[in-house]
Amino acid sequence: MSKESSPPKVPSTTMEYERRLEAAAEIILEKEAKFSNTPPDCSEFGVTATLKPHQVEGVSWLIQKYLLGVNVVLELDQMGLGKTLQAISFLSYLKFRQGLPGPFLVLCPLSVTDGWVSEINRFTPNLEVLRYVGDKYCRLDMRKSMYDHVKKSSKGHFLPFDVLLTTYDIALVDQDFLSQIPWQYAIIDEAQRLKNPNSVLYNVLLEQFLIPRRLLITGTPIQNNLTELWALMHFCMPLVFGTLDQFLSAFKETGDGLSGLDVSNDKETYKSLKFILGAFMLRRTKSLLIESGNLVLPPLTELTVMVPLVSLQKKIYTSILRKELPGLLELSSGGSNHTSLQNIVIQLRKACSHPYLFPGIEPEPFEEGEHLVQASGKLLVLDQLLKRLHDSGHRVLLFSQMTSTLDILQDFMELRRYSYERLDGSVRAEERFAAIKNFSAKTERGLDSEVDGSNAFVFMISTRAGGVGLNLVAADTVIFYEQDWNPQVDKQALQRAHRIGQISHVLSINLVTEHSVEEVILRRAERKLQLSHNVVGDNMEEKEEDGGDLRSLVFGLQRFDPEEIHNEESDNLKMVEISSLAEKVVAIRQNVEPDKEERRFEINSSDTLLGNTSSASLDSELDEASYLSWVEKLKEAARSSKDEKIIELGNRKNLSEERNLRIEAARKKAEEKKLATWGAHGYQSLSVEEPILPDDVDSSSDAGSVNFVFGDCTNPSTVSHEPAIIFSCVDDSGNWGRGGMFDALSKLSNTVPTAYHRASEFKDLHLGDLHLIKIDDNDDQQNTQASKPLWVAVAVTQSYNSRRKVPRSSISIPDLESCLAKASFSASQKSASLHMPRIGYQDGSDRSQWYTVERLLRKYSSIFTVKIFVYYYRRSP
């Protein structure tokens, strides 16, 4: 054998580490084999539910591992297999069979805390559970209650609960308290949160918390690489699995795909790792359970629909690349900046989703209309899909990665008058649970929202906030408008509908923009899923080389002719083709035999649907030379476009200089007279001048934000710890109102109504005026942080005429925009955040006005890079 063909030598320390793991696995499996095969009767330790065979087997496995002193991972194939019931049945065993007094700790996402409490109360009613969530004051009250209980109770039962249920974030915030409790068992639900061994959460739980016995529940032990697998196994058994370097040295080839080892050695490595994992991990896949007859689920059909970009999207897509041209040229010559590259990818993905994700793209005035749908190829296809799904009586889970995309989709739902629920990271736990209950309430007579508004047609969910733990089997269709970076997250999200309790054929539709960065992400997702299957599944398949970051960005660009990008007819989508596509996609649920093959469709000018079961391939022909050729074309097109804009702007400058001078002279004279009167009476205006909008606004910038919160906007200290401006609308009557914001601002400081009255007295109260009133520390009765500057911005946006039938007018949108611009500019100058009630609902305005207001908020938060908080007022029960 030649030197080149000889397999590399494996270091002895690596062999020793691997053999040690194999020996530990052998000991565990041998002892486990000696246990009785008689399944436990869960009713004997207080479980009221009838468990399915695979659930009984899971509880039995947990019991055996506990008795052997082994901490384990329970992987339930993207969930949906009753993991909560198995976990609480096991806790009931510990409490009532083993006699452990507790306490037991359960960590899980906020969105599923209600589900855990509900199942504990229903199926293990003898277990006392405490849901330790809420704001810091609520949790402080719970801690005081625990302390009082401990003082009064005997040593036999010193805590008022058996199970404490809380979230990962609260575990970190309240670690000083929670880490002092000697937990007799801990369950980490959705344990993929522990995939990063360098994270604060990982190390705090491992080093600070008293949790010697642990169970990790996950549907995705491997999401990106073997480091994540080691992190979970090391968290369970730190002494057994040693260091990360040892683990990677022993099993690195299983994650590399092309390892340099011969095939036989490669297979042996897979075999060894799978054997070791078998002692510490129980993997329950739906496919195996269905094949064995232990689980019956309705069919699942998965489709990928390749959607083209419309003309506006192409313009934005290429303009992003044009803007990033210097960085891309640096990449093509070998340089790279990972952070910069990621930012470009994010902007390209936004262009694929919807152009209105970029400030300044939506045409003004901001009004609901078909322009919202026509601006995005994805939304055009989604529109046709939802129309047919609604008419057919189906219900839909609509997943998006970005919450800003959900904002646009929500506007679309309002435009089409579809009933919907929404769940994202900003929704409080109580509202989440209510939304899930509302959506899950089925009716027997279809989904006509006008007949029964309690049953939403669509449940819109941000993948990261609601993609795990929820039970939404009321839906039989799942649509992914955007794909998560991690394919396992989308797989988990799909299980919200395709799980135990589902009785309908489930259709999953993945919308992917063809010939774009999204298609590259799709391909890489397939490779990540293959890695997971290789290590903990049954097959092994060599993976291909990575396409490279530059090729990912410029994938498909050779199909974009820069000279035709501005020609809308060159890529005009025919509604007949889209309609035909939607018809076939929706009908496929009835027309095809269920199988595991993922089908892929694309819109095509000659053939509306093209089935393509092969993976999306990276463009091997796109080398540096062809890319640079495209760049030169793009530069030429950019220069041509710029010249046209200069000519167009030049033609618009046709103003009368003489007229402007006359107006300016009259204004100056009136201003001097007014200031003289004010000076004589000691009045100083608090009105803010018109801001000068910056010329270099980056329309693709993510700076600034609009946040929706619950609470009182006149007490912003609970949300923000920075200087704050409270924004409130008034009329021009000079009469300070009563109730609502008027009373709240008067209570905050008498300075506010006084300043308003003074402005009216000196005729300084006009529509579009914004008066910025400083709240002195002595006057501020609510602000608990005396050192934090606070202002009130009184926006004059309504006229008042006593002779009108309704004296006070509705809010004037142009005047509101002027006030918002001034307030945002002032906030930017003072490094402050902006706080306001939900404008547009106060005076009974319709939904379309709020659509306009929300767009204006996003516009000026982006221009002046300020944070705006919109408050939903929670009324007392």
Swiss-Prot record:
One of its GO terms (biological process) is chromatin remodeling. It is an enzyme of class 3 (hydrolase). Gene3D superfamilies: Leucine Aminopeptidase, subunit E, domain 1 (3.40.220.10), P-loop containing nucleotide triphosphate hydrolases (3.40.50.300), Tandem AAA-ATPase domain (3.40.50.10810). Residues 64-239 form the Helicase ATP-binding domain. Its EC number is 3.6.4.-. Belongs to the SNF2/RAD54 helicase family. This is Probable helicase CHR10. It comes from Arabidopsis thaliana.
